[in-house]
Amino acid sequence: MAFPTSSAQQAETNRKILEEIQTKKQLLIGLGSTANQMPAPQLLGQPTVTAEFVQNVSATPNAAGGIAAPRSAFNPTSSTTLGFFIPQDSYFGNSFIPVLPRLEPVPTPPAPNSK
């Protein structure tokens, strides 16, 4: 790799590097905003969540006595899991309990006898 010999070449190299970083930053910011607009993937066998349940979860009081705002955690979680959630009152700030389905273990085939 050749190094610039004069301060003018050094300044030009620094300017190009900064421009490249700025364009990459703008690209990443643009990708981040479109990723937030994409819907979450839906899984097969996912239970439906009623509006009443969402209201119960969002109105659960937290340890400070105020209304917790679990909706920011509840929505992405409920859209990406096979389980469901039960609202609860908690002094620790846990506004809902996850309930996951019990899956039966896959039977393993018997090992062949080697003689």
UniProtKB/Swiss-Prot annotation:
It comes from Drosophila mojavensis (Fruit fly). PANTHER family: SOSS COMPLEX SUBUNIT C. GO terms for cellular component: nucleoplasm; SOSS complex. GO terms for biological process: DNA repair. The lineage of its organism: Eukaryota, Metazoa, Ecdysozoa, Arthropoda, Hexapoda. Belongs to the SOSS-C family. InterPro entries: SOSSC. This is SOSS complex subunit C homolog. It holds the Pfam family SOSSC.
